[in-house]
């Protein structure tokens, strides 16, 4: 595929008012996407159903969402596309609505876990998955063409969805077994002042839990600020203070999950993924799990011990999903809390992932600590080394020798990961080992080989 000009691995993202996150670009993007979707609709229309394609737009709670939503709506309408405005809903809700309403595409306005100063726009296909590469490429090409407008009789209509949140709440609940409930469970749910603020608490409450909700007072500027999956320590304090059984933390667009138990212990994506997979194994065989380059070595070892395959993808839920689809596997995720259960949904969903963890705990009548007790997480040490101009670390003899020595010493008791930073001229040296001292010494040995 040719180099992308506008789209990154997760749509278009940047600072509000910058080159791509502004009203003018969003208008052009809406028109370009509309033209491509209209063409696809004409080429694949069966002669039945809607005369023109429909698209749903959902957003998180950033103040800039109003501006971008209006601009996208105008561009899509100018291209002859009908628009459904879902308002503030989680990213995975847009994927669900697109699929269940048989729409041409879904559009999400969100910068996920970033602060309010940033925003982004990404698309879902009619199947609730990422757009095919050829469609993204066609939209990029159309972006460089002049802005136009269809005839007045062909303009798209727009209407607000009154039931978007309610539909999604029911979908989430449908992924929790009908023979179970959450009666007697005391939860703290942190929605990060984000897209799930009026959704997630209802899901758990309607299943029977006693819910105390935090991070549910968005003002356009406080999304992810000191709350949510990026700051689970806030949730841990609230769980302890209220004597709750568990805490559930989502990020700004609710596709990421962290959990906390009654003692205040924080559980990351690797531990929660294991909790889900262990329960699924009691229903039948699990062929394999996809993690990333950053997935803890302890999860890899534990999965191997219980007979589950494990593969690493590049960092990013897009790459995890691609590898899951290529292998036909159902489960995958990232340490950050992006968890994919393709037997429940087509994309990562923090609320649904939490329900799958709760399913495991209710079935086993166990605490979270008890359920993942056999998963031993390996201590991790990372050292960032500045890269001298012109230095090719991949062919550096000293680093190669040090890496060989470290890997020989670890010999199945840990792993080494060396990768260049994508944002600054630094080399990231990461070692995971059975004990912290060994991880520290091994990482330092790698750094010393570069004169750091």
Curated annotation (Swiss-Prot):
Example of a GO biological process term: UDP-N-acetylglucosamine biosynthetic process
Maturation and modification: Activated by phosphorylation.
Molecular functions (GO terms): magnesium ion binding; phosphoglucosamine mutase activity; phosphomannomutase activity
Residues annotated as binding Mg(2+): 112, 251, 253, 255
Enzyme Commission number(s): 5.4.2.10
The protein's required cofactors: Mg(2+)
A GO CC annotation given for this chain: cytosol
Xref: Pfam families: PGM_PMM_I, PGM_PMM_II, PGM_PMM_III, PGM_PMM_IV
InterPro entries the UniProt entry points to: A-D-PHexomutase_a/b/a-I, A-D-PHexomutase_a/b/a-I/II/III, A-D-PHexomutase_a/b/a-II, A-D-PHexomutase_a/b/a-III, A-D-PHexomutase_C, A-D-PHexomutase_C_sf, A-D-PHexomutase_CS, Alpha-D-phosphohexomutase_SF
UniProt KW keywords: Isomerase, Magnesium, Metal-binding, Phosphoprotein
Xref: SUPFAM superfamilies: Phosphoglucomutase, C-terminal domain (SSF55957), Phosphoglucomutase, first 3 domains (SSF53738)
Phosphoserine: modified positions: 112
Protein name per the record: Phosphoglucosamine mutase
Classification of source organism: Bacteria, Pseudomonadati, Pseudomonadota, Betaproteobacteria, Burkholderiales
